[in-house]
Amino acid sequence: MESSLPQVAALDRSTLLKAFDETKTGVKGLIDAGITEIPSIFRAPPATLTSPKPPSSSDFSIPTIDLKGGGTDSITRRSLVEKIGDAAEKWGFFQVINHGIPMDVLEKMIDGIREFHEQDTEVKKGFYSRDPASKMVYSSNFDLFSSPAANWRDTLGCYTAPDPPRPEDLPATCGEMMIEYSKEVMKLGKLLFELLSEALGLNTNHLKDMDCTNSLLLLGHYYPPCPQPDLTLGLTKHSDNSFLTILLQDHIGGLQVLHDQYWVDVPPVPGALVVNVGDLLQLITNDKFISVEHRVLANVAGPRISVACFFSSYLMANPRVYGPIKEILSEENPPNYRDTTITEYAKFYRSKGFDGTSGLLYLKI
């Protein structure tokens, strides 16, 4: 009898997940319904909720880099290259200020994502889908049916480059802003990839010529206030499967980066953007730049809004093969990974979900 209990529990969980998904109202729908306790499908394994705090030291805050001028003169350029290379190598995360994207564009992007998630439920349901190939998708937890616990957030996402959605496919609340903001992020990304190329000792356009800047996936996240934030997470520990990610976050906070086995807070800085190295950049730089794990805490305050832009073609057809850059390999620095395509890696990454392990282990030699 006892041996059948796990099967019964799994069946019950599957039923609950299906029922939640079929509402098409996401986590916000639970809050709108007035819940005071989180459903069991959101209860995270206790081990994933641990929060070892770093020593009280400035050494445990991610670097902030001033991009003012974009390194147009040689002295400033060398300084920027050194700072960004150092941050990508030691932290995998950094914030940028004076990045060239106007404050009003940042604010309108945050407001647009909020308006989408808070609009009439029936309108929002029209965008609900679990098809990753869709041009425009609203859902809650892409790995809902495979993860140990669901995350406390809802997401609107679309590819905005190289082929943005048709105007008629965009949400009225934020569609135009998503396209405008993406264009600004693409310009910033081009500069960052140039600086990262130079930090590797390569030609300025090396990473661009590898098509690292060609595709952009934009995800607008909505983290509703949580009645029991100590029992769940806004986003489970994971690393990104991109080349580079640029994140816009509002004032609520909750993002943490794993550094030297400590969870380090990334406090919101007005006007700043958070940049992090993705798995694909770690792969092609042969571990020179690191893709580190990060997570988002649930919060009784909220909603928290963030907009993440991923430089990667993800599940879009892309036959190009990627492996460690040959120009940086040597006898002392042999390749650590086998070659792959973005599509192959993205499918593996999606199938494993946010299980707390690095997808790069799949490609290790």
Curated annotation (Swiss-Prot):
One of its GO terms (molecular function) is dioxygenase activity. Its cofactor is Fe cation. Fe cation binds at residues 238, 240, 294. Keywords: Iron, Metal-binding, Oxidoreductase. Residues 212-313 form the Fe2OG dioxygenase domain. One of its GO terms (biological process) is biosynthetic process. SUPFAM superfamilies: Clavaminate synthase-like (SSF51197). Belongs to the iron/ascorbate-dependent oxidoreductase family. This is 1-aminocyclopropane-1-carboxylate oxidase homolog 1. It comes from Arabidopsis thaliana (Mouse-ear cress). The lineage of its organism: Eukaryota, Viridiplantae, Streptophyta, Embryophyta, Tracheophyta.
